[in-house]
């Protein structure tokens, strides 16, 4: 609520579509079933070739004034499409929606209640139809700045953000996942909060953008590694450091993280760019010292510190977060 406790804060929903006819109606119906009033539903279509656009027009006609539909003149890809669509939002907050998920009725109301003064709020989510699979398999329990420098654990489809925060980000690189970029800026700004409850069902299937990107991303990695990250993590790290988007990402963070406010994340960002063995050793020692902020698992004590020490190698092994680079 606003300061006068009478008018709900306005929330825009932003969805990007591409050939989403199979599940689009289910997601639209779940958005319309929210128990929180929506300011607008913005949908930006990336040149779909199926019936997606016709479905969108049907919903827009059934709900005059609520839907704002846009169709790109050329295909932008999901990263650029989401960024440009987010800039169209006019509500005080903006919620990001995939085209094929299902939102639970209290998703928006619970996130508006939780966000407080933070720039970003995200939540747990389910990925199975019966809502039974453990949530920790899909959202890391760690939301510390230090951990999120290694891992994108804030999925865009679960985000609610302050619109002025999104529009205040001046530099974007479309070879960096848009949701990771948003979460990093939130960490450098007024922070982020997490609702420890599943507020949507995220659908994984062969045609989804997420599934396509992740399949494209994995390289030289076994599905359930044991010793491999320790043996091959260094080589994978060197491979990542040669990628332009990797260097852009950590150079930007090294230059923009406030060293007085976030001394450890600032140091980690700088060390992620260095090649020499002493820099790797220093990074490993930092991760061992602050393992409770960095390592996503539950090990404590000596075991936790050992896992933390090797986390720079563990996180580099099979890392797919920089595979958008062409």
Model region roles, listed by residue range:
Residues 45-54, 74:
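A conserved acidic beta->alpha catalytic loop
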Residues 20-33:
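Short, well-formed alpha-helical segments that are part of the catalytic scaffolds
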Residues 175-176, 181, 188, 192, ...:
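C-terminal subregions of glycosyltransferases and related glycan-biosynthesis enzymes
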Residues 72-89, 110:
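Glycine-rich, basic loop-to-helix element that forms the pyrophosphate-binding segment
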Residues 9-12, 40, 181:
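Cell-envelope/extracellular polymer assembly enzymes that use nucleotide-activated donors
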Residues 87, 141-220:
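Conserved nucleotide-sugar donor-binding catalytic segment
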